[in-house]
Every structure is written in structure tokens, then in C-alpha cells.
């Protein structure tokens, strides 16, 4: 009789070896925020069949499956493994993208409902618009405190863990100034896990919104990525209509979607 077990683990080396294989199966890049924020903070489990490790999965505190992989010779078991996760009460839902069809479809098979969570975009390699004269400069350490204050006031993000300092040290954070006021910021984060990609993102001063600054900054970040031989990607949630419009105007297209899938 087939015996499948799920073993909690904090052994990142084993998980990373499996994850490298998972990444090779993706039909589009994974969003770095999803990987670095949500998946990274979830609980990893090794999947064992007859006492042999065949893959892993990641489950958050709410019982949502965020990532799962099984090796090639055991792919046929994916639907069974999802069923076992449900029956063992380890998961009640999944938040997965269509970039990995095997696990995504297995969860759809067991689903009772689903909702769209996040749109993930790739760049269409559009040329920089002639009218894009936004003056963008690299953020240097002396501006770090100003950026932190800007994020708190205009984004609602209180950086207490060195986020800004990390981006500045990696030369991945940019800003646009009007006189001495930060009117927009841009990030061009070179992925350490997906070496062909860079995640780009922007924010706009609350007093300077609806002027097209987000689109212009996104275009600038996209071209900074391309100059470093990286393909720009970005994402936004379903409820952020303004961001969706700015992203699409900048020349990005939605290549995959992260769905919340209810399993029970």
C-alpha cells in the first residue's frame, strides 16, 4: 500500500535542491515578492513516499499551499498528494500560479472555488517613449533616511529591517526629484534565483499621482534591467486598478496569474 508522509523541515539545502528542479519546469518567471516574502516565511515539508524523499511543499500559517514539487518519476502522484494534504488537514486552500501546470491543475481538480489574487507581468521590450524625460538617479547612502521617511509617508511602509539599505548597497534603488522633493522611486532588483530576470517596482508621492509618473518610472526601470541583460518582471494585486493601468501603459503584459484556490 502506498505510504506518503509530510515531514516538517528547516533544512534549506534539501529544499533548495528540489526548488532548482521546480524552477526549471516553470513556463514563466515566478514573482520575487511571492517567493521572498510569502513562500520564504512559510513552513516547508519534505514529501516522502515509502521513506524516500520525492519532493517538498510549503504551507503558510493559514493552511494555504504556496509551493509544491515532486520529482519526475512521481509526477503521476500529484493529485493523490494534494488529496492527502487535504485529508491530513495540513491544507485547506492553495495560492498557486499557472506557471507550474502540474500542481496548479491538481489543485483545480480538488477545488470548490477560486479567486484571482495577483497579476504577474513580463515586458514586451517596447522602446522607451520619446516623451519620457523623467530624470531618474541612483539612490546613494546619504539619501537612505529620506527614502525611509518617504516610504512611511507615501507608501505606508515602515522599514525597520534594512530593506532600503539592502537595495542601496546593491545599487537597485532609484528616485526622481522635483527640487528637493522625492516625487517617485523605482526599484530594479536583480533576481538571485532567476538569473535572467529583474523585478521592477515603483512608488509615487501622494501629491504627484495621476500624472503618469508610475508609467514613466516603470519604463525607466525596465530599460535599466534590459541594459543588464535581465528581463523585467513585475506584479500587482487584483484590487490595484491604478497599478494595473500604469503597468500595461509601460509596456508590460500579464503572463500568469496567482489564484487563491479553496479546497474544502
Region annotations inferred by a language model:
Residues 130-198:
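Flexible, substrate/cofactor-facing loop regions flanked by secondary structure
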Residues 74-87, 204, 210-225, 244-249:
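Conserved acetyl-CoA-binding loop-helix of GNAT-fold acetyltransferases
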Residues 1-29, 125-158:
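Short amphipathic alpha-helix that is part of the acyltransferase structural core
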Residues 95-106, 234-245, 253, 262-264:
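Conserved beta-strand-loop-alpha-helix junction that forms the acyl-donor binding cleft
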Residues 60-64, 70-134, 261-262:
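Acyl-donor-binding surface of acyltransferase catalytic domains
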Residues 29-86, 182-198, 203-206:
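Conserved donor-binding loop and adjoining core beta-sheet/short helix segment
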Residues 26-36, 95-99, 157-167:
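A short, aromatic/hydrophobic, helix- or strand-capping loop or linear motif
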Amino acid at each position: 500500500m502506498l505510504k506518503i508522509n509530510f515531514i516538517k523541515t528547516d533544512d534549506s539545502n534539501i529544499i533548495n535542491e528540489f526548488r532548482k528542479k521546480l524552477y526549471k519546469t516553470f513556463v514563466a518567471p515566478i514573482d520575487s515578492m511571492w517567493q521572498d516574502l510569502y513562500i520564504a516565511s512559510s513552513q516547508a515539508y519534505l514529501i516522502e513516499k515509502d521513506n524516500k524523499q520525492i519532493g517538498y511543499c510549503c504551507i503558510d500559517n493559514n493552511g494555504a499551499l504556496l509551493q509544491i514539487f515532486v520529482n519526475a518519476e512521481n509526477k503521476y502522484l500529484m493529485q493523490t498528494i494534494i488529496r492527502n494534504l487535504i485529508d491530513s488537514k495540513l491544507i485547506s486552500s492553495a495560492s498557486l500560479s499557472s506557471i507550474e501546470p502540474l500542481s496548479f491543475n491538481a489543485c483545480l481538480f480538488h477545488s470548490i472555488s477560486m479567486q484571482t489574487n495577483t497579476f504577474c507581468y513580463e515586458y514586451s521590450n517596447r522602446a522607451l517613449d520619446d516623451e519620457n524625460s523623467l530624470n531618474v538617479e541612483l539612490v546613494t547612502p546619504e539619501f537612505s533616511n529620506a527614502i525611509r521617511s518617504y516610504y512611511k509617508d507615501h507608501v505606508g511602509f515602515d522599514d525597520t529591517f534594512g530593506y532600503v539599505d539592502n537595495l542601496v548597497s546593491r545599487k537597485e534603488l532609484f528616485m526622481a526629484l522635483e527640487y528637493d522633493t522625492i516625487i517617485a522611486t523605482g526599484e530594479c532588483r536583480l533576481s538571485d534565483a532567476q538569473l535572467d530576470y529583474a523585478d521592477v517596482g515603483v512608488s509615487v508621492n501622494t501629491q504627484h499621482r495621476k500624472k503618469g509618473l508610475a508609467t514613466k518610472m516603470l519604463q525607466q526601470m525596465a530599460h535599466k534591467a534590459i541594459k543588464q541583460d535581465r528581463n523585467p518582471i513585475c506584479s500587482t494585486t487584483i484590487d490595484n486598478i491604478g497599478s494595473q493601468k500604469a503597468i500595461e501603459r509601460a509596456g508590460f503584459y500579464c503572463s500568469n496569474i496567482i489564484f487563491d484556490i479553496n479546497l474544502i
